[in-house]
Amino acid sequence: ILIDLAGLWSANRISIFNTRICPVQISWLGYNNSSGLKEVDFILADVNTVKEEEKYYGPNIYKIPKIWNSHCGFDYKRTYNELPFKKNRYFTFGSFNNFMKVNDDVLSTWIKILKKTKNSKLILKSSLFVCEEVIKKRFEEEGLINSIQFEKKTKRNDFLTHFNLYDKVDLCLDTFPFNGVTTTFEALWKNVPVITKAGFNFNSRCGESILKNANIANFIALNNEDYINKAVYYANNIDKLEDVRKELFEEIEKSSIFDTTGFSSAFCKALNDMILDVNKNYR
């Protein structure tokens, strides 16, 4: 079995698949949509990430029962910290996603949230200076330049500094239609809920799948208005948000998203099923 982890991203090895060097070739994890290659037999997904559009995919879709991706957790002891709001007396939203995922629709939505929540702030983590300047200009035009804060990119060997940034955040905001994945796992491990928006394809449903499997599906918005309303609601209902954070602290490690043992079993079964399927077609 050959597994593609890059798809059409830069520095990919997609040409290897053209030669059909393995009887079973699948796409998983790194590139969540079809690459268009007929030599890719399967895309590994789940029931939440690929729905009615499945018929438009070239490869077969294999749906793992719970979630297409699981995380082993992070090598840092989990602690429960009170909401930053209680110390700051202002509400802090955060999004540490790659700036490539931050489009005009996302910015407009975040701006509306900040305008509806008095004395609130938004922390973004920047690695692209040009994007940072564009975003600053947009917020300045909206009279919100003092409501945005940028954290600089941390070094790869200094993950703890990055991880501790979540201690400054009351509620995380996901990007759309290209959702975060690693950042959502990080936030939930740190007991910080994430507002996401359900989308129309695999990449735009990653947040939906993670939050459903984390048992906080009520943080999944159906549209932009719902996204805004949910963010504003929790900013104005601190006790409700704190209840969710406490629940995450107590339960998140037991959920499907961090159940690597259960996921490994499902993953191995998936690979075996794919081999059987390909062998059947060769007979």
Annotated model-derived regions:
Residues 1-12, 16-37, 158-206:
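A donor-sugar binding/catalytic signature common to diverse glycosyltransferases
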Residues 175-260:
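Catalytic binding pocket for nucleotide-activated donors in carbohydrate/polymer assembly enzymes
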